[in-house]
Amino acid sequence: MFGPRHFSVLKTTGSLVSSTFSSSLKPTATFSCARAFSQTSSIMSKVFFDLEWEGPVLGPNNKPTSEIKAQSGRINFTLYDDVVPKTARNFKELCTGQNGFGYKGSSFHRIIPEFMLQGGDFTRGNGTGGKSIYGEKFADENFAKKHVRPGLLSMANAGPNTNGSQFFVTTVPTSWLDGRHVVFGEVADDESMKVVKALEATGSSSGAIRYSKKPTIVDCGAL
């Protein structure tokens, strides 16, 4: 069970604030897209990432095997335009690149198994950069959606009202992030969640990617 001393905020500096965050205390969760996605009330815009990476091949029940190889796959996302329209628009336009910059060619720079995948730093690639379509930072829109399950899309930040382009995808429920990070979308389907699990297997408890080819967004856009 998580208590107040285990609260950690996902920062855009590439490190967790609290040194007491322990992988042994993270909740274990099973994931069923059919159950989770059917309960979603805000089905709006859809976008995608096409990714390439090196890492373990998944076996039964999406568990990593000892076989390591170059892989590729797609993650489809559904955005909550009706709940957080400004945040959803930012992510969508960074996917399309219509403003002359965006996620294409960037990588997931920080992955912690049984926690999350963090990406979106397309200027520096290490968790210290990125920018929004509105300028450098924009305010937290609201915290209506909670981090209640795997497969949720949420904004990484450097504190209140410091949203840019960095985001994370949960791989377990992360309720200690509620009220601190804006949830603005979700992984759209089971096949996409399999890709999330494959990317999760490339990470480590420190967040460092364990293989030479980081998970890279080779293409992205709107569906």
Curated annotation (Swiss-Prot):
PROSITE patterns, per the entry: CSA_PPIASE_1, CSA_PPIASE_2
Gene Ontology BP, a term: protein folding
One GO location term (cellular component): cytoplasm
UniProt EC number: 5.2.1.8
Enzyme class at the top of the EC tree: isomerase
InterPro entries: Cyclophilin-like_dom_sf, Cyclophilin-type_PPIase_CS, Cyclophilin-type_PPIase_dom
Localization annotation: Mitochondrion; Cytoplasm
Keyword Transit peptide: yes
Transit peptide interval: 1-44
Enzymatic reactions: [protein]-peptidylproline (omega=180) = [protein]-peptidylproline (omega=0)
Keyword Isomerase: yes
Gene3D superfamilies with a match to the protein in the record: Cyclophilin-like
SUPFAM superfamilies referenced in this protein's UniProt entry, alphabetically: Cyclophilin-like (SSF50891)
Regulation: Binds cyclosporin A (CsA). CsA mediates some of its effects via an inhibitory action on PPIase.
Pfam families named among the record's database cross-references: Pro_isomerase
All copies of domain PPIase cyclophilin-type, residue ranges: 62-222
UniProt keyword terms in alphabetical order: Cytoplasm, Isomerase, Mitochondrion, Rotamase, Transit peptide
GO molecular function, a single term: cyclosporin A binding
Recorded family membership: Belongs to the cyclophilin-type PPIase family.
Biological role stated in the UniProt entry: PPIases accelerate the folding of proteins. It catalyzes the cis-trans isomerization of proline imidic peptide bonds in oligopeptides.
Protein name: Peptidyl-prolyl cis-trans isomerase, mitochondrial
Organism: Neurospora crassa (strain ATCC 24698 / 74-OR23-1A / CBS 708.71 / DSM 1257 / FGSC 987)
Lineage: Eukaryota, Fungi, Dikarya, Ascomycota, Pezizomycotina
Gene it is expressed from: csr-1
